UniProtKB/Swiss-Prot annotation:
Pathway: Carbohydrate degradation; pentose phosphate pathway; D-ribose 5-phosphate from D-ribulose 5-phosphate (non-oxidative stage): step 1/1. Pfam families: Rib_5-P_isom_A (PF06026). PANTHER family: RIBOSE-5-PHOSPHATE ISOMERASE. It comes from the Bacteria. Keywords: Isomerase. It catalyses: aldehydo-D-ribose 5-phosphate = D-ribulose 5-phosphate. GO terms for molecular function: ribose-5-phosphate isomerase activity. Substrate binds at T32, G33, S34, T35, D85, G86, A87, D88, K98, G99, G100, G101, K125. CDD domains: RPI_A. The gene is rpiA. This is Ribose-5-phosphate isomerase A. Its EC number is 5.3.1.6.
Length: 223
């Protein structure tokens, strides 16, 4: 199977998992990226089975609306049963690195609200230790140099992601060469740096369920 086929398989598995639990009042949280796009496309075939969605980015909102799925602002939603999103890396404890698509802050907010966070990924994303994928950090633009210096003190090699602005109007610094053995601690340390909006570690609030696309089929991992 190609990587695209694996993504489509896990996206369909996520739809199959949540569909029996949805009703006409249900609102689904939806992530950002190529795997999340596969989920949106699969979910759209069942749009009559639920009320609408909360999007983690402008790009996701546009794709949902393109399928005729109503998109709600998170502040107007009192109950979010599911959040479905991809990941750049996951460890066996379902701690994640996310933010390759620069939507990490809104993704983290929607994940925090949802009762169940379902991560969908192809098998290459499961790693023994996080950090081979550069860790994205969303930063207030004027704090870029200060934050970079602090990230060096934490052992990282920060690289400014040129030409990228988040939906919130901020910049991204990608932190290379980190072996993240304590993701909960590092997430808190980076978030404590003045000028950081948030970072791409999803460890304080990890995924509840990981659907992993492999050549042997979709595997399910739980915490």
């Amino acid at each position: 199977m190609t990587q695209d086929q694996l993504k489509q398989a896990v996206a369909q598995a996520a739809v199959d998992f949540i569909l029996p639990k949805l009703d006409d009042k249900s609102i689904v949280g939806v992530g950002t990226g190529s795997t999340a796009n596969c989920f949106i496309d699969a979910l759209a075939k069942h749009k009559a089975a639920f009320d609408g969605a909360v999007a983690s980015s402008e790009a996701t909102a546009a794709r949902l609306k393109g399928h005729g799925i109503p998109v709600y602002e998170l502040n107007t939603v009192s109950d979010l049963e599911f959040y479905v999103d991809g990941a750049d890396e996951s460890d066996e404890h379902l701690n994640l690195i996310k933010g390759g698509g620069a939507a990490l802050t809104r993704e983290k907010i929607v994940a925090a609200v949802a009762k169940t966070f379902i991560c969908i990924a192809d098998g290459s994303k499961l790693v023994p230790v996080l950090g081979a994928f550069p860790l994205p950090v969303e930063v207030i633009p004027m704090a870029r140099s200060h934050v970079a210096r602090q990230l060096v003190k934490l052992g990282g090699d920060p690289v400014y992601r040129e030409g990228v602005l988040t939906d919130n109007g901020n910049i991204i610094i990608d932190v290379h060469n980190m072996s993240i053995t304590n993701p909960v601690e590092l997430e808190a340390q980076i978030n404590a740096i003045v000028g950081v909006v948030t970072n791409g570690l999803f460890a304080a609030r990890p995924a509840d369920l990981l659907l992993l696309g492999t050549t042997e089929g979709v595997k399910t991992l739980t915490r």
